[in-house]
Curated annotation (Swiss-Prot):
Residues 6-254 form the ABC transporter domain. Keywords: ATP-binding, Cell inner membrane, Cell membrane, Membrane, Nucleotide-binding, Peptide transport, Protein transport, Translocase, Transport. Transmembrane segments: none annotated. This is Dipeptide transport ATP-binding protein DppD.
């Protein structure tokens, strides 16, 4: 049984007459101990979908779903008190920018201990001991003195380590890492990812890794979901997707990598931008940017269908040579 089972999740912003679908009917599962990568450009709905799972979408956002099952609990119908006990304990999240996620008015030790107090209680000494253990676990040197420093006294890399310590404080079963290395330099990025994956294996956590960095997700994830304009356009194992992308958008993302541009003077890029509220096309949402789009693509929205072990949302999925082929059904 899946640890997390998301069915037909949507997130709308704006008024009910003209809502904007930031997330549009996505469904996926995460198994116990699995590392799932969610990739896509900025504006694809990656972060918003995870904030919806965490219950962090405020007005004017509206969340709807057939179900949001964590273990045997539906997060959508869970009463507020029970949800507060579950979110942050069994399900935790690391946010993009540690410098804005930590409260500048409190020491890092206080903030970690506050999370422990909220979810686990215990004595003040036990909470402090656990905080010191966590700071040491995430590789912060001299935790006995760092426990009393404020966020502005730490570097970006150290602040992100504090965020990781706070997220894993209550030993979550599912950890969502939203662009955990975006604000960090390349060397620190590698250290943070190595730490996250080491902790994931040690604690047997499930990990959802949200990123636009395909090289990063290739090394870390077992399975990948590709999102575009709030929709899932492709899903499969990391090996399959990198070896043989089926969706034109996935192909375009991969072709933008330096590894795929050997012998070329310029990297390939996908022209245009992710559509917003007022420029969403009919039919396939990628059709204004897709080099393979047909008149049928411009009129009819494709469904997410199975091609072998893969799921692809395209009328003309790509073959082994990277050329479009009309979909003939399962």
């Amino acid at each position: 049984m899946a640890l997390l089972d998301v069915k037909e999740l949507s997130v709308h912003f704006g008024d009910k007459k003209t809502p904007f679908k930031a997330v549009d009917r996505i469904s996926y599962q995460v198994a116990q101990g699995e590392v799932l990568g969610i990739v896509g450009e900025s504006g694809s709905g990656k972060s918003v979908s995870s904030l919806a799972i965490m219950g962090l979408i405020d007005h004017p956002g509206r969340v709807s779903a057939e179900s949001l099952q964590f273990e045997n609990t539906d997060l959508l119908t869970l009463e507020s008190k029970a949800k507060r006990q579950l979110i942050g304990a069994d399900v935790a999240m690391i946010f993009q920018d540690p410098m804005t996620s930590l409260n500048p008015a409190y020491t890092v030790g206080f903030q970690i201990m506050e999370a422990l107090k909220t979810h686990e209680g215990g004595t003040k000494k036990a909470r402090k001991d656990r905080t010191l253990e966590l700071l040491k676990l995430v590789g912060i040197p001299d935790p006995e003195s760092r426990i009393d420093v404020y966020p502005h006294q730490l570097s970006g890399g150290m602040s992100q380590r504090v965020m990781i310590a706070m997220a894993i404080a209550c030993r979550p079963k599912l950890l969502i890492a939203d662009e955990p290395t975006t604000a960090l330099d390349v060397t620190i990025q590698a250290q943070i990812m190595e730490l996250l994956l080491e902790l994931q294996k040690k604690e047997c956590m499930s990990l959802i890794l949200i990123t636009h960095d395909l090289a990063l997700v290739a090394e870390a994830a077992e399975r990948i979901i590709v999102m575009y304009a709030g929709q899932i356009v492709e899903e499969g194992t990391a090996k399959d997707i990198f070896r043989e992308p089926k969706h034109p958008y996935t192909q375009a993302l991969l072709r933008s990598l330096p590894e795929f541009a050997e012998g070329k003077s310029r990297l390939e890029s996908l022209q245009g931008v992710v559509p917003g509220k007022y420029d969403r096309p009919t039919g396939c949402l990628l059709n204004p940017r897709c080099p393979y789009a047909t008149e049928y693509c411009r009129q009819v929205e494709p469904q997410l269908h199975h091609i072998g072990s893969r799921k692809v949302k395209c009328h003309t999925p790509l073959n082994e040579q990277g050329n479009p082929v009309e979909y003939q059904g399962a």
